[in-house]
């Protein structure tokens, strides 16, 4: 069954791990097209602080889902999933495989697993259900469940208080039955066979040094002027907007407001980027069925190329 599904490749990694450079090399040698999986690169006019690929790179290796909205707008994980699925179908129809490249792990998870899923336990709702059960008993609660979710109720004994409570809790939190949510989740499973590649550094200190060098280069390369230009072009832009919460932009706004000096701007920008990398690596460690490649290895391209070639030929 899986072998008949079209192939897709995830190329994931923390910021400054070399994802873009590797992806560009791969698409020039293989039948792939890049879809950006980056919540910062979706914004127009935000080039320096997002380390957006330059025009020369984009001409050699076009990236989908770059520059899709302006900084005043919001782009959700749900919107990403919708756009990515459409693009993946188009790429597949052209006889190529989608190469999804980036570090926004929530987007990767949403694409792979869908938007469904059950809500976390809610102490207040559970307390309400316990009070109701104290009055009418769990068989009475089971009857309530049968009225809204007969399929789940049919699988449960009237005395199965824990599962009855959970099913009623889910309904009260979402307005949907457990049965409906499970069906929704099944329908959202990604209809592709996946190769998931994670770039991770064998030496975290080298990644930290890269991050520091890159942020300093952004400062010298016009980050301040870029943010000044954004404020001029989009007068309603403010620090609480999603676009301005991107790493580097928040700190630059603080500097422009006179709240921090040059050294603090630099230090806070580097620290925030390192924190982002730490969160990205934590997500990656929790992902299943992932091929981990050391992004500091000289032959990382060769390793990725061989893995993808083998994956694409397995049809």
Curated annotation (Swiss-Prot):
EC number, as in UniProt: 2.5.1.75
Cofactors named for this entry: Mg(2+)
Keywords tagged on the record: ATP-binding, Magnesium, Nucleotide-binding, Transferase, tRNA processing
SUPFAM superfamilies: P-loop containing nucleoside triphosphate hydrolases (SSF52540)
Catalyzed reaction equations: adenosine(37) in tRNA + dimethylallyl diphosphate = N(6)-dimethylallyladenosine(37) in tRNA + diphosphate
EC category name: transferase
InterPro entries to which the protein is assigned, alphabetical: Dimethylallyltransferase, IPT, P-loop_NTPase
Entry keyword Magnesium: yes
Binding-site positions, ATP: 13-20
Domain of life: Bacteria
Residue ranges of the region described as Interaction with substrate tRNA: 38-41, 162-166, 245-250
BP-aspect Gene Ontology terms: tRNA modification
UniProt-annotated site: Interaction with substrate tRNA, residues: 104, 126
Positions contributing to substrate binding: 15-20
GO molecular function terms noted in the UniProt entry: ATP binding; tRNA dimethylallyltransferase activity
Function summary: Catalyzes the transfer of a dimethylallyl group onto the adenine at position 37 in tRNAs that read codons beginning with uridine, leading to the formation of N6-(dimethylallyl)adenosine (i(6)A).
UniProt cross-references to NCBIfam families, sorted A to Z: miaA (TIGR00174)
UniProt family annotation: Belongs to the IPP transferase family.
Complex and partners: Monomer.
Name this polypeptide is given: tRNA dimethylallyltransferase
Organism from which the protein derives: Methylobacillus flagellatus (strain ATCC 51484 / DSM 6875 / VKM B-1610 / KT)
């Amino acid at each position: 069954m899986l072998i008949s599904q079209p192939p897709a490749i995830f190329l994931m990694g923390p910021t400054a791990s070399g994802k873009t450079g590797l992806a560009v090399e791969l698409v020039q040698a293989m039948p792939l097209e890049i879809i950006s999986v980056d919540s910062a690169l979706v914004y127009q006019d935000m080039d320096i602080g997002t380390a957006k690929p330059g025009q020369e790179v984009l001409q050699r290796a076009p990236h989908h889902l770059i520059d899709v909205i302006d900084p005043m707008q919001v782009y959700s994980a749900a919107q990403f999933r919708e756009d990515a699925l459409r693009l993946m179908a188009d790429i597949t129809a052209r006889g190529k495989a989608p190469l999804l490249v980036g570090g926004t792990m929530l987007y990767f998870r949403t694409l792979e697993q869908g938007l469904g899923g059950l809500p976390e336990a809610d102490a207040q709702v559970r307390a309400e259900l316990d009070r109701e059960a104290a009055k009418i008993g769990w068989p009475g609660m089971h009857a309530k469940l049968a009225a809204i979710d007969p399929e789940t109720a049919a699988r449960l004994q009237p005395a199965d208080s824990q599962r009855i409570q959970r099913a009623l809790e889910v309904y009260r939190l979402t307005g949907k039955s457990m049965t409906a949510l499970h069906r929704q989740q099944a329908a959202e499973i990604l209809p592709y066979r996946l190769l998931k590649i994670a770039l991770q550094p064998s030496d975290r200190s080298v990644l930290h040094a890269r991050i520091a060098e890159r942020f300093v280069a952004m400062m010298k390369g016009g980050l301040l002027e870029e943010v000044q230009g954004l404020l001029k072009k989009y007068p309603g832009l403010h620090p609480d907007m999603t676009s301005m919460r991107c790493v580097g932009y928040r700190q630059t706004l603080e500097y422009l407001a006179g709240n921090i000096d040059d050294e603090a701007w630099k230090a806070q920008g580097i620290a925030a980027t390192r924190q982002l990398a730490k969160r990205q690596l934590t997500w990656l460690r929790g992902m299943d069925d992932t091929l981990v490649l050391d992004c500091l290895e000289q032959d990382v391209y060769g390793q990725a190329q061989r893995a993808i070639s083998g994956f694409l030929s397995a049809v």
